[in-house]
């Protein structure tokens, strides 16, 4: 598990350029104070495969369907990792996951991270 790079990018028409670690304190409380997230991811060992998956999502494919096709981990569950608390995930992944806004598989707000496992495309379905 080496150093990783983290970056966020939005899916669909809305692009999220939030930096890992940014905390947004708006009236809905979406970003600040979450201690756990319900997270999905697509894991690809190869950068080129990750880019193909990203392209499908950006062209309107549902996140869970792309996960079943491209992910090398948790593909049968549509990429679902379930609820994860702070400290349970590798730091680059965690920083992105906790900085993302909640979204749906049909209109995901996605982020990217690189860990020792490979390249991750990440989305968050819930926060608490």
Curated annotation (Swiss-Prot):
GO terms for cellular component: nucleus. It catalyses: [protein]-peptidylproline (omega=180) = [protein]-peptidylproline (omega=0). GO terms for biological process: rRNA processing. Residues 1-35 are annotated as: Disordered. Residues 34-126 form the PpiC domain. It comes from the Eukaryota. Its EC number is 5.2.1.8. Residues 12-29 have a biased composition (Basic and acidic residues). Keywords: Isomerase, Rotamase. PPIases accelerate the folding of proteins. It catalyzes the cis-trans isomerization of proline imidic peptide bonds in oligopeptides. Belongs to the PpiC/parvulin rotamase family. PIN4 subfamily. PANTHER family: PTHR45995. This is Peptidyl-prolyl cis-trans isomerase pin4.
């Amino acid at each position: 598990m080496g150093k990783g790079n983290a970056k966020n990018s939005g899916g669909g028409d809305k692009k999220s350029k939030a930096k890992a670690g940014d905390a947004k304190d708006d009236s809905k409380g979406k970003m600040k104070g979450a201690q756990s997230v319900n997270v999905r991811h697509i894991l690809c060992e190869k950068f080129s495969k990750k880019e193909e998956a990203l392209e499908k999502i950006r062209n309107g494919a549902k996140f869970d369907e792309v996960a079943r096709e491209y992910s090398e981990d948790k593909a049968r569950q549509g990429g679902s990792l379930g609820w994860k608390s702070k400290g349970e995930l590798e730091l680059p992944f965690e920083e992105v996951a906790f900085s993302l806004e909640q979204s749906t598989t049909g209109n995901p707000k996605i982020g990217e991270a690189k860990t020792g496992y490979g390249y991750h495309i990440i989305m968050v379905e819930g926060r608490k």
